């Protein structure tokens, strides 16, 4: 896959993930509370959760303009989604009243997280925008 095709896939993943975080989570919490809203219902918690993910979604949409220069944000979104999904998976397994989440928000976050990390990882160089020369590391010299 050439760089242009890869960047097109990255942009697509960022746009879809951003839109899911902005609109999908709030919508699914209303339409399918058993899979996306934890009990007991706490509107304050839900509003904070929706606000944080909507904000992340907006920044993922902005990152789609130039994925290479937003690598840290994309990796944060990916890894934090994986960690969040894993923690919720453990909680859902331990609490029988929350097991529906194992087919709801848990796999949704894990899938989005893995895909975000995958489209960001494979051996691509990190773009350095600083004009300040980096100090030489003697440990990395090859003689």
Predicted regions and their residues:
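Juxtamembrane membrane-water interface segments of multi-pass membrane proteins
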Residues: 1-7, 31, 35, 60-74, ...
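Membrane-helix boundary elements
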Residues: 6-44
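Core segments of alpha-helical transmembrane spans in multipass integral membrane proteins
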Residues: 18-27, 43-65, 76-86
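Hydrophobic core of alpha-helical transmembrane segments in multi-pass integral membrane proteins
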Residues: 18-29, 107-121
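Non-cytosolic membrane-interface motifs at loop->transmembrane helix junctions
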Residues: 37-45, 75, 97-108
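Central hydrophobic cores of alpha-helical transmembrane segments
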Residues: 74-80, 131-135
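Membrane-helix boundary connector in multi-pass membrane proteins
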Residues: 86-104, 121-122
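Membrane-water interface at the C-terminal end of transmembrane alpha helices
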Residues: 110-134, 143
């Amino acid at each position: 896959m050439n760089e242009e095709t890869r960047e097109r896939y990255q942009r697509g993943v960022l746009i879809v993930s951003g839109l899911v975080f902005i609109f999908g989570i709030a919508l699914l919490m209303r339409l399918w509370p058993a899979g996306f809203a934890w009990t007991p219902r706490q509107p304050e918690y839900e509003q904070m959760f929706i606000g944080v993910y909507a904000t992340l979604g907006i920044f993922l949409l902005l990152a789609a303009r130039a994925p290479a220069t937003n690598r840290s944000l994309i990796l944060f979104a990916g890894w934090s989604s994986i960690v969040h999904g894993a923690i919720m998976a453990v909680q859902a397994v331990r609490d029988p009243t929350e097991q529906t989440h194992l087919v709801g928000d848990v796999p949704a976050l894990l899938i989005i997280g893995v895909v975000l990390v995958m489209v960001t990882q494979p051996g691509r160089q990190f773009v350095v925008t600083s004009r300040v020369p980096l100090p030489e590391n003697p440990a990395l010299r090859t003689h």
